[in-house]
Amino acid sequence: MSRVERIKGCLLGGAVGDALGAPVAFLEWPVIEARFGVQGISDFAQAYGITGAISDATQMMLFTAEGLLRAFVLGSSRQLCHVPSVIHHALLRWLTTQDHPSVI
């Protein structure tokens, strides 16, 4: 398996896990058990009004990955690149998607 395939698997696995866990993220076990049975959640359920919805955690994971990729490209082209700053800028772009006033 190539590095790119492993990276894609990590991103997909994170998103799928987030979508499975989002409906129960802030619930206590007795509430989860009452809604989904003793086995807990085992299939996609509604979160934020959407079945299989991802949360802000997956959104930020993807924006962080985009920042890492952008930093890699900048570094590969021998441009000055401060990786934390590039990732910070990527996360600021995420913040603007959350109806937050632009800080970029």
Description of each model-found segment:
Residues 1-104:
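Structured, active/binding-site neighborhoods that engage oxygen-rich ligands
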